[in-house]
């Protein structure tokens, strides 16, 4: 208030010494009066802010202390009898029941409620009891990148109430406990883990608790109870699961193993009949007399008791049959032994079905077709079986190996819905990747193309001066060009003097290399200041200004791809059992040649400093395949195909003779086939991706006035 008093004294003194006329006096009084009012308002505002508590979004219930999972100090709370309970909202969708405005900064944050034990004061019953499995789930979230101790910044809320197994808690009391949570708000943005829903006699496929608008991470969904795009299907965990070193390609005696104990009787009868008809290929097991769940005994007397789940490694396929409950722990037990699941459960929503392609690692068969299962399995080739076994092994180690992995996978599935721009592609979710570099995209790509920087044209030339000068003149008029760098790859002859080059308005620089290597075109020269690089041969003079400008605009939208003009395809020849390079026009492409293509300068660094094996040296020695090597490199890291732009397919230099053009040599073509075969062996796989599309301008070939088209001169074939 000191500032206000000083201002008032100043006003008083001003009035005392003022000797102006009445009109000026009135104006001065009004001015001083307004200043006094503003000063008083500011003073009261500052006083209010300094004296009032700064309530957060949850009105003072903020807790910024990191949660400690101390089982010795669990808070005991009484269930609020007046808390409103609402049944599960079966119509919930991602857009209706999830408040995405709580999910800020492009990251998923989960708040975990403190360990609490809700007690009914009338019956003195506890709502739920914490199991070791749920403790592991809480611990996994607590130690993950998703956890936040501040509910104000949380996107999701995870109760510490253990609802994994509906058989061990009172569902009515559990619903009341949920409604008593501080931030429940009808379950909005809350996630509930449940693996064993329902109970006798109905065995519902979803948790029989009043969860209102909460998201269910459930292990027993069918197609009727699952809310697509909202709930997340998770596996039913097995306490008997052990990590054993089963081999995906190991010799397995039986085609099909059946060791599930709770298959419905009508299906067991069918399996008994199949076992009699295929006794050498089907191993049918049941419970032993001592009811030891870690052992299985044959329904016939041909085999001794076997240890479970190790026995599953004896079969190529293992059956998951229909039982009273939809979800069963047998699925993860089967996968732990790298056995291919044969799923004979109609309408079962498989774990993480939204992102995992189960057709690559399982066989689904309708329940009423169980009698034909052996016939269907025999029709699968041995090569396909090995592929599926490897996929099962990879999926298990990636998403199912322990409760921590299951928990974090479920959260990532939900995160991919909330932040789709950061989501992994289906290929990334399902592709076995033996190369560490291809597990992530190294480029930090914005959701929208940034403001154009332009591109640097890097021209590789040797001695074709006339063609080089013509190309420079054509490039200079491209609006998006920033500069030109000429790589003079001839050590026996100096490049023409800069004064003899065409006079252009864009910066032009010349570098003479020390050795004649094709890899020189991909060296990250310091003269390259843009992210976009157009690598172009000195004889590619047929491209128009619009074609080049449009190609750059496409690259801006897909900067992690190779974007260009000449396209090729790789094919497998069954006769020679080798990969073949094909330049004929087909409906598919898998490579874009860097004789005229845009790429990010990051790939120049990778090509120069991190090319696998001896690929770079081999390219320089044979003076061939540098463009194929670049396509392999980018595809291996990103798992993305190149993008061809515009319909042009002919790139022959009109002034060049056939002997001048390297691609006209038949030996050159044979070497390129050998390159593809050699590179695939070095990478240990075929990383090239095949696509059946190209990019053309929106109004391409439309009956539209040329003046209204941005790109008129797209050229011909």
UniProtKB/Swiss-Prot annotation:
<dbReference type="GO" id="GO:0046872">
    <property type="term" value="F:metal ion binding"/>
</dbReference>
<feature type="binding site">
    <location>
        <position position="489"/>
    </location>
    <ligand>
        <name>UDP-N-acetyl-alpha-D-glucosamine</name>
    </ligand>
</feature>
<protein>
    <recommendedName>
        <fullName>Exostosin-2</fullName>
        <ecNumber>2.4.1.224</ecNumber>
        <ecNumber>2.4.1.225</ecNumber>
    </recommendedName>
</protein>
<dbReference type="GO" id="GO:0050509">
    <property type="term" value="F:N-acetylglucosaminyl-proteoglycan 4-beta-glucuronosyltransferase activity"/>
</dbReference>
<keyword id="KW-0479">Metal-binding</keyword>
<keyword id="KW-0879">Wnt signaling pathway</keyword>
<dbReference type="GO" id="GO:0000139">
    <property type="term" value="C:Golgi membrane"/>
</dbReference>
<feature type="topological domain" description="Cytoplasmic">
    <location>
        <begin position="1"/>
        <end position="25"/>
    </location>
</feature>
<keyword id="KW-0333">Golgi apparatus</keyword>
<dbReference type="GO" id="GO:0005794">
    <property type="term" value="C:Golgi apparatus"/>
</dbReference>
<keyword id="KW-0325">Glycoprotein</keyword>
<comment type="function">
    <text>Glycosyltransferase required for the biosynthesis of heparan-sulfate and responsible for the alternating addition of beta-1-4-linked glucuronic acid (GlcA) and alpha-1-4-linked N-acetylglucosamine (GlcNAc) units to nascent heparan sulfate chains. Plays a central role in diffusion of morphogens hedgehog (hh), wingless (wg) and Decapentaplegic (dpp) via its role in heparan sulfate proteoglycans (HSPGs) biosynthesis, HSPGs being required for movement of Hh, Dpp and wg morphogens.</text>
</comment>
<dbReference type="Pfam" id="PF09258">
    <property type="entry name" value="Glyco_transf_64"/>
</dbReference>
<feature type="binding site">
    <location>
        <position position="521"/>
    </location>
    <ligand>
        <name>UDP-N-acetyl-alpha-D-glucosamine</name>
    </ligand>
</feature>
<comment type="similarity">
    <text>Belongs to the glycosyltransferase 47 family.</text>
</comment>
<dbReference type="GO" id="GO:0030210">
    <property type="term" value="P:heparin proteoglycan biosynthetic process"/>
</dbReference>
<dbReference type="GO" id="GO:0008375">
    <property type="term" value="F:acetylglucosaminyltransferase activity"/>
</dbReference>
<keyword id="KW-0472">Membrane</keyword>
<dbReference type="GO" id="GO:0005783">
    <property type="term" value="C:endoplasmic reticulum"/>
</dbReference>
<dbReference type="InterPro" id="IPR029044">
    <property type="entry name" value="Nucleotide-diphossugar_trans"/>
</dbReference>
<dbReference type="GO" id="GO:0005789">
    <property type="term" value="C:endoplasmic reticulum membrane"/>
</dbReference>
<dbReference type="Pfam" id="PF03016">
    <property type="entry name" value="Exostosin_GT47"/>
</dbReference>
<keyword id="KW-0217">Developmental protein</keyword>
<comment type="subunit">
    <text>Interacts with sau.</text>
</comment>
<feature type="active site">
    <location>
        <position position="627"/>
    </location>
</feature>
<feature type="binding site">
    <location>
        <position position="464"/>
    </location>
    <ligand>
        <name>UDP-N-acetyl-alpha-D-glucosamine</name>
    </ligand>
</feature>
<feature type="binding site">
    <location>
        <position position="538"/>
    </location>
    <ligand>
        <name>UDP-N-acetyl-alpha-D-glucosamine</name>
    </ligand>
</feature>
<feature type="topological domain" description="Lumenal">
    <location>
        <begin position="47"/>
        <end position="717"/>
    </location>
</feature>
<keyword id="KW-0464">Manganese</keyword>
<feature type="binding site">
    <location>
        <position position="539"/>
    </location>
    <ligand>
        <name>Mn(2+)</name>
    </ligand>
</feature>
<feature type="transmembrane region" description="Helical; Signal-anchor for type II membrane protein">
    <location>
        <begin position="26"/>
        <end position="46"/>
    </location>
</feature>
<keyword id="KW-0256">Endoplasmic reticulum</keyword>
<dbReference type="InterPro" id="IPR040911">
    <property type="entry name" value="Exostosin_GT47"/>
</dbReference>
<keyword id="KW-1015">Disulfide bond</keyword>
<comment type="pathway">
    <text>Protein modification; protein glycosylation.</text>
</comment>
<feature type="glycosylation site" description="N-linked (GlcNAc...) asparagine">
    <location>
        <position position="574"/>
    </location>
</feature>
<feature type="binding site">
    <location>
        <position position="672"/>
    </location>
    <ligand>
        <name>UDP-N-acetyl-alpha-D-glucosamine</name>
    </ligand>
</feature>
<keyword id="KW-0735">Signal-anchor</keyword>
<feature type="binding site">
    <location>
        <position position="626"/>
    </location>
    <ligand>
        <name>UDP-N-acetyl-alpha-D-glucosamine</name>
    </ligand>
</feature>
<feature type="binding site">
    <location>
        <position position="516"/>
    </location>
    <ligand>
        <name>UDP-N-acetyl-alpha-D-glucosamine</name>
    </ligand>
</feature>
<dbReference type="GO" id="GO:0016055">
    <property type="term" value="P:Wnt signaling pathway"/>
</dbReference>
<dbReference type="InterPro" id="IPR004263">
    <property type="entry name" value="Exostosin"/>
</dbReference>
């Amino acid at each position: 208030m000191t500032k206000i008093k000083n201002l008032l004294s100043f006003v008083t003194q001003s009035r005392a010494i003022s000797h102006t006329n009445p009109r000026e006096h009135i104006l001065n009084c009004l001015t001083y009066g307004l200043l006094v009012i503003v000063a008083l308002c500011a003073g009261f505002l500052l006083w209010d802010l300094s004296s009032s508590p700064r309530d957060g979004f949850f009105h003072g219930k903020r807790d910024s202390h990191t949660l400690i999972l101390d089982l010795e100090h669990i808070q005991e709370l009484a269930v609020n009898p007046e808390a409103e309970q609402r049944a599960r909202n079966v119509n919930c969708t991602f857009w209706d029941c999830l408040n995405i405005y709580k999910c800020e900064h492009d990251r998923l944050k989960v708040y975990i409620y403190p360990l609490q034990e809700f007690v009914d004061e009338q019956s003195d019953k506890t709502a739920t009891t914490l199991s070791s499995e749920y403790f592991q789930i809480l611990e996994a979230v607590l130690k993950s990148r998703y956890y936040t101790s501040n509910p104000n910044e949380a996107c999701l809320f995870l109760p510490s109430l253990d609802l994994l197994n509906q058989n061990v808690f009172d569902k009515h009391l559990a619903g009341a406990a949920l409604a008593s949570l501080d931030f429940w708000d009808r379950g909005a943005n809350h996630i509930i883990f449940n693996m064993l829903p329902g109970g006798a006699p109905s065995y519902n496929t979803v948790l029989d608790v009043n969860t209102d608008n909460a998201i269910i991470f459930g292990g027993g969904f069918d197609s009727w109870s699952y809310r697509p795009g909202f709930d997340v299907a998770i596996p039913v965990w097995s306490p008997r699961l052990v990590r054993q070193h089963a081999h995906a390609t190991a010799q397995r005696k039986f085609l099909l193993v059946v060791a599930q104990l709770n298959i419905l009787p009508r299906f067991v009868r069918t399996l008994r009949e199949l076992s009699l008809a295929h006794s050498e290929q089907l191993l049918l097991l049941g419970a032993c007399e001592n009811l030891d769940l870690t052992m299985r005994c044959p329904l016939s007397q041909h085999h001794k008791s076997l240890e479970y789940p190790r026995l599953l490694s004896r079969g190529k396929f293992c059956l998951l049959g229909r039982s009273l409950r939809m979800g069963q722990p047998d699925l993860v037990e089967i996968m732990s032994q790298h056995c291919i699941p044969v799923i004979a459960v109609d309408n079962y929503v498989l774990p993480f079905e939204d992102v995992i392609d189960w057709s690559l690692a399982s066989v689904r068969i309708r329940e009423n077709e169980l009698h034909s299962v052996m016939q269907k399995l025999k029709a699968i080739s041995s090569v396909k079986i090995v592929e599926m076994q490897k996929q099962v092994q990879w999926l298990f180690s990636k998403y199912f190996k322990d409760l921590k992995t299951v928990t974090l996978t479920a959260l990532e599935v939900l995160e991919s819905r909330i932040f789709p721009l950061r989501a992994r592609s289906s290929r990334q979710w399902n592709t076995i990747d033996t190369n560490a570099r291809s597990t992530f995209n190294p480029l930090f790509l914005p959701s929208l193309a940034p403001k154009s920087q332009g591109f640097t044209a890097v021209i590789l030339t040797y001695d074709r001066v006339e063609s080089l000068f013509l190309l420079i003149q054509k490039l200079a008029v491209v609006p998006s060009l920033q500069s030109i760098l000429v790589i003079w790859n001839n050590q026996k002859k100096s490049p023409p003097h800069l004064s003899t080059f065409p006079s252009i308005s864009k910066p032009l620089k010349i570098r003479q290399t020390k050795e004649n290597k094709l890899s020189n075109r991909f060296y990250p020269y310091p003269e390259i200041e843009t992210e976009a690089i157009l690598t172009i041969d000195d004889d590619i003079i047929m491209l128009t200004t619009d074609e080049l400008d449009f190609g750059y605009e496409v690259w801006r939208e897909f900067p992690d791809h190779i974007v260009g003009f000449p396209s090729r395809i790789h094919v497998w020849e069954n006769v020679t059992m080798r990969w073949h390079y094909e330049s004929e026009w087909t409906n598919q492409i898998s490579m874009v040649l860097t004789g005229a293509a845009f790429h990010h300068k990051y790939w120049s660094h990778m090509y120069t400093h991190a090319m696998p094996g001896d690929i770079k040296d081999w390219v320089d020695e044979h003076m061939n395949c540098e463009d194929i090597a670049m396509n392999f490199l980018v595809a291996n890291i990103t798992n993305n195909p190149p993008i061809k732009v515009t319909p042009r397919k002919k790139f022959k230099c009109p002034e060049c003779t056939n002997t001048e053009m390297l691609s006209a040599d038949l030996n050159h073509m044979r070497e390129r086939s050998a390159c593809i075969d050699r590179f695939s062996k070095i990478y240990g796989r075929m990383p090239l991706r095949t696509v059946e599309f190209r990019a053309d301008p929106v109004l391409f070939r439309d009956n539209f006035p040329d003046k209204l088209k941005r790109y008129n001169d797209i050229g011909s074939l």
